């Protein structure tokens, strides 16, 4: 019986010890930062996968699917190519004297006049597209001794045979075709674009029927250039009932220069000139519909927003557009390192600081305090450190956009077959530029993300050190982002620590006294586990002894009989 009483006393003594830190003479103050249940993964210089509370996508990966007609003037080519509109194909007459910022060519565009080719098609197309106008001025060329305004059934204008409206097909008059020698000076202060051509008959009979001479010749000159073309007579694939063809050429006459045309046959003469303008107009092949909306950036896929620094919708763009990169996604960290809060905090609901985990539910700030004292628990944000971090992060996105947005258009590149090697080289250069920009973009974002995370970590450390300097010897760093305060610290006291008005001298004596007392209790209570295990072992031993003694006593009295057989 004495043993049982002694063991009961030991158990009661062990569990009657006060839990350190749970009395009214101490308090706990923890510092922490905002956290979310599911963060966003970003890349930094040192880590390919680091979780942050918030991030902004930097790559625009989709278009609106339509081309906006504002603020750029969009001219829909419909079923006409730009060159057909330039030459005056009958079904493209609606484009005469039109202007544009962006001419949109459709995949269903077709020619509906006499068969032609342009030896330097891409250059002429680009030249006219960048001029942004089809403004045409008719001039009084004098063509003596020939028949003008030739036409063809392949180029009907209404029910009658016709021809390109900007060109004049000259044929023999009677049985003669004299040598033509015409000059046209440029007395204006702008460049003039003259379009002319050479007819290639399908047979020698057609050649003499139209031009008398068995072989014609066309020479067009300025002070800066000269082109001489000899017709190539021969049958070609039939197009709209014709096996002949026309080659289209062009000449630019500078102010003060003179255009000279010399020919003895096969001349497709100009009727005037196109007024050349300088600007940033362009052309784009696209089947996206044109709609009434606003967008600064246009791609063949449709307009895209330019509020992001990068895009991977299309390499071809017009306007102020994000830079094209290969990556589908690049995320810019706009929040701090995310460490989700641990849900289980022990039997007594202990709180922990930023070293263990972040705090979810902090909607009024990025950094803050949690406390546990005689009045309960509480939480408050630290607005000063929060604002310091936000001020430095804000503007990151705009700065990246300013560094990368193109203020010009990336035109389509076209080359003739004979320029295949140049095309291959140009493609290699463009691909290299894209690779370089893609690498630079990833590096730039990784650097910015590293800076953001280091910055937010630094603000947390600054707040922790500021609190440590206030508390001094009145509290002990618990190693998890918390301080154990060794004096009674009510809510007013906690608030003074948060706002920086805490006076450690007021509580110094109380803190020192409590520190020594609590340390002593903690030292004694450190043997509690040993006492419990020893008590348990002794109890088990005594129970076994009592049970064995009972069995032996019963056997002696005859109450229990034990037979052993061999």
Swiss-Prot record:
- Covalently attached lipid (S-palmitoyl cysteine), positions: 555, 562, 565
Q: Which residues form the signal peptide?
A: 1-16
Q: Where does this polypeptide localize? A: Virion membrane; Host apical cell membrane
The record's section on InterPro entries has:
Capsid_hemagglutn, Hemagglutn_HA1_a/b_dom_sf, Hemagglutn_influenz_A, Hemagglutn_influenz_A/B
- GO process annotations (BP): clathrin-dependent endocytosis of virus by host cell; fusion of virus membrane with host endosome membrane; fusion of virus membrane with host plasma membrane; viral budding from plasma membrane; virion attachment to host cell
Query: Any additional notes?
Result: Major glycoprotein, comprises over 80% of the envelope proteins present in virus particle. The extent of infection into host organism is determined by HA. Influenza viruses bud from the apical surface of polarized epithelial cells (e.g. bronchial epithelial cells) into lumen of lungs and are therefore usually pneumotropic. The reason is that HA is cleaved by tryptase clara which is restricted to lungs. However, HAs of H5 and H7 pantropic avian viruses subtypes can be cleaved by furin and subtilisin-type enzymes, allowing the virus to grow in other organs than lungs.
Function, as annotated, reads: Binds to sialic acid-containing receptors on the cell surface, bringing about the attachment of the virus particle to the cell. This attachment induces virion internalization of about two third of the virus particles through clathrin-dependent endocytosis and about one third through a clathrin- and caveolin-independent pathway. Plays a major role in the determination of host range restriction and virulence. Class I viral fusion protein. Binds to sialic acid-containing receptors on the cell surface, bringing about the attachment of the virus particle to the cell. This attachment induces virion internalization either through clathrin-dependent endocytosis or through clathrin- and caveolin-independent pathway. Plays a major role in the determination of host range restriction and virulence. Class I viral fusion protein. Responsible for penetration of the virus into the cell cytoplasm by mediating the fusion of the membrane of the endocytosed virus particle with the endosomal membrane.
The protein here is known as Hemagglutinin
């Amino acid at each position: 019986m004495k043993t049982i009483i002694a063991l009961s006393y030991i158990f009661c003594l062990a569990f009657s010890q006060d839990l350190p830190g749970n009395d009214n003479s101490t308090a706990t103050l923890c510092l922490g930062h905002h956290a979310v249940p599911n963060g966003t993964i970003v890349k930094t210089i040192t880590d390919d996968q680091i979780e942050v509370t918030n991030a902004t996508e930097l790559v625009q990966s989709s278009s609106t699917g339509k081309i906006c007609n504002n603020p750029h003037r969009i001219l829909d080519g419909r079923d006409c190519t730009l060159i057909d509109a330039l030459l005056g194909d009958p079904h493209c007459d609606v484009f005469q004297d039109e202007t544009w910022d962006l001419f949109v060519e459709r995949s269903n565009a077709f020619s509906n006049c006499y068969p032609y080719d342009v030896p330097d098609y891409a250059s002429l197309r680009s030249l006219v597209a960048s001029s942004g106008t089809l403004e045409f001025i008719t001039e009084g060329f004098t063509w003596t001794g020939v028949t003008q305004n030739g036409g063809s059934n392949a180029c009907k204008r209404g029910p009658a045979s016709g021809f390109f409206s900007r060109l004049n097909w000259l044929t023999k008059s009677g049985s003669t075709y004299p040598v033509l020698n015409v000059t046209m000076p440029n007395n204006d202060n702008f460049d003039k674009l003259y379009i002319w051509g050479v007819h290639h008959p399908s047979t020698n009979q057609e050649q003499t029927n139209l031009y008398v001479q068995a072989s014609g010749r066309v020479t067009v000159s300025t002070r800066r250039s000269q082109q001489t073309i000899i017709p190539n007579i021969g049958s070609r694939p039939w197009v709209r009932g014709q096996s002949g063809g026309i080659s289209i050429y062009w000449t630019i006459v500078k102010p003060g220069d003179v255009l000279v045309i010399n020919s003895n046959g096969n001349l497709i003469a100009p009727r005037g000139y196109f007024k050349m303008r300088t600007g940033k107009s362009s052309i784009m092949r696209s089947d996206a519909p044109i709609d009434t909306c606003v967008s600064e950036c246009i791609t063949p896929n449709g307009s895209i927003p330019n509020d992001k620094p990068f895009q991977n919708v299309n390499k071809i763009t017009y306007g102020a557009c994000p830079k094209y990169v290969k990556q589908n996604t690049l995320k810019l960290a706009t929040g701090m390192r995310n460490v989700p809060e641990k849900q289980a905090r022990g039997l007594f609901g202990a709180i922990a600081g930023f070293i263990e985990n972040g705090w979810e539910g902090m909607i009024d700030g990025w950094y803050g305090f949690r406390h546990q004292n005689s009045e309960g628990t509480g939480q408050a944000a630290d607005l000063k450190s929060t604002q310091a971090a936000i001020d430095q992060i804000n503007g990151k996105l705009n700065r990246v956009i300013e560094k990368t947005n193109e203020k010009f258009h990336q035109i389509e590149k076209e080359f003739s077959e004979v320029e295949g090697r140049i095309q291959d080289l140009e493609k290699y250069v463009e691909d290299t530029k894209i690779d370089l920009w893609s690498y630079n973009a990833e590096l730039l974002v990784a650097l910015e993300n590293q800076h953001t995370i280091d910055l937010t970590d630094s603000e947390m450390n600054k707040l922790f050190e500021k609190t440590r300097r206030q508390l001094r010897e009145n509290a002990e760093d618990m190693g998890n982002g918390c301080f154990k305060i060794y004096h009674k610290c009510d809510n007013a006291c906690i608030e003074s620590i948060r706002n920086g008005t805490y006076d450690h001298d007021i509580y110094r004596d109380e803190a020192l006294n409590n520190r020594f007392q609590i340390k002593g209790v903690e030292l004694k209570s450190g043997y509690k586990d040993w006492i419990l295990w020893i008590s348990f072992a002794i109890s088990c031993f005594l129970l076994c002894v009592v049970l064995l003694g009972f069995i032996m006593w019963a056997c002696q009295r005859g109450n229990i009989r034990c037979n052993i057989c061999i």
